[in-house]
From Swiss-Prot:
This is Lymphatic vessel endothelial hyaluronic acid receptor 1. Mainly expressed in endothelial cells lining lymphatic vessels. SUPFAM superfamilies: C-type lectin-like (SSF56436). The chain crosses the membrane at residues 239-259. Gene3D superfamilies: Mannose-Binding Protein A, subunit A.
Amino acid sequence: MARCFSLVLLLTSIWTTRLLVQGSLRAEELSIQVSCRIMGITLVSKKANQQLNFTEAKEACRLLGLSLAGKDQVETALKASFETCSYGWVGDGFVVISRISPNPKCGKNGVGVLIWKVPVSRQFAAYCYNSSDTWTNSCIPEIITTKDPIFNTQTATQTTEFIVSDSTYSVASPYSTIPAPTTTPPAPASTSIPRRKKLICVTEVFMETSTMSTETEPFVENKAAFKNEAAGFGGVPTALLVLALLFFGAAAGLGFCYVKRYVKAFPFTNKNQQKEMIETKVVKEEKANDSNPNEESKKTDKNPEESKSPSKTTVRCLEAEV
């Protein structure tokens, strides 16, 4: 019971003391001795001769929106040229003075942060700390200037005229005596962007018994050679394009031979005439099959260049810009 009573009495005394301090100390009575805060540290005192005890020092800093500084914070301010000639309370419970140069009247000719341990009831000034300060000296704003590198870029525009001329290419089949038609496209206007051209000519020779396809790819002269031969025509691989052309030529040749050999009158006048033509064609095919083995054995002994069978040649050319 006695312990509870003593605890209540202690709390009541603390609360009463705090009310007395808050009621007796006002912000109008305070004076800031050091107007410029160094590293957030300033010295606060009362305008009257009577100064502050340790409890009043905490309350004075609080009324100004600050907090009671610690000894380490005062030492940091000392390194930034913070110097006073008055002792003041710090949060460690004793008073200190910050001195850069010795002076008999200030700190007894001492240098640095000098400590003086006294009872908390003694009255001194107070060292208050502002945690929101970012400048070394609050009176001298620090302007951070960032110099952006200036690049003097001089762009030299050089225009080179490229005259692309297509040479005349003559493609002929070794199995035909008919020369292929020549292709001479007009030279394009000069431009600053070099262009590459490919001229793909496919010569198709149609014979009665066989079809020969020859492909040539003359390359237009240019300063830069093609580094990747697998690059295709307009995004399509060259091999696929060649195969497509070969299949197309073969189909066209077979169709031509079929029309030339079997179809004599088109369209058919009536169904009876069509049946007669089909029957005649079947009889001719049977005769041709009987005579084919003998003819094939004879053709194998002959050179393809000595063939006297008539042939027709067509040339298809494609020009593409790469």
